[in-house]
Amino acid sequence: LGYLTKLGKITLSTSVYYNYTKNSFQMVRYVEGLNPDGVPITTSSFVNIGEENRAGFEFTLNYSPYKWWKLNSNFNLFRVQTKGDFYYSYFDVSNNLIDKVQNFDNTASSWFARINSKISLPSKIDWQTNITYNGPQNNAQGNVKGIFAMNLAFSKDVLKEKATVALNVNDVINSRVRKLETYIPGQIDSDSEMQWRKRQITLSFTYRFNKLKTDKDPK
């Protein structure tokens, strides 16, 4: 269910939504065994834990203050409810099989936001900035901290628009790090971090043979 309106240079849209997932997969940490000193050996993997109900509100704003500057943003607030149990087994130091079950019934609220800016600089250089933030969220095993990230991109058409030179900087301040606090009574109490990829800077050159950038693909 959504609503769209335009006020001068501003375009606003709002919507509410509901999603139901019968087989919901989540990242789960569990004890796979014990080392000779009795310290738990933990494993992280995606597991089908049961069902998920998600409801939320989304707000989108597009704004062009000038011909050379375009802004678009998105804000999403949601509430998620999970239901299910996770069964697993491991051997203790005496080689006894230990059966465990963890309940994943949980309700949490969170949000995420995105802002994208596109500026046309002199000499027909395009400058794009993308900023995202995923808010913190609790789960049945602990919580995930908020994640902030920013990307930059500069591009220019050359050779009579037959080619494009682009400079991209992904994760400018090296902040796209997933921080987890995990607590399972009697088994796990830990803080961990996971970074998919550190800051990257790439320079690319794309040439379009027998085709201008403004040409349309043949139907």
Segments from the language model and where they lie:
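C-terminal beta-barrel architecture of Gram-negative outer-membrane proteins
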Residues: 107-158, 173, 181-182
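Residues that define the transmembrane beta-barrel architecture of outer-membrane proteins
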Residues: 6-8, 51-55, 103-111, 146-150, ...
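C-terminal beta-signal and adjacent terminal beta-strands/loops
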Residues: 156-219
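Transmembrane beta-barrel strands of outer-membrane/channel proteins
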Residues: 3, 14-20, 73-79, 129-133, ...
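Outer-membrane beta-barrel translocator domains and adjoining extracellular loop/strand segments
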Residues: 16, 24-33, 38-40, 83-92, ...
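Repeated loop/turn-to-beta-strand initiation elements of outer-membrane beta-barrel proteins
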Residues: 9-12, 67-71, 123-128, 160-165, ...
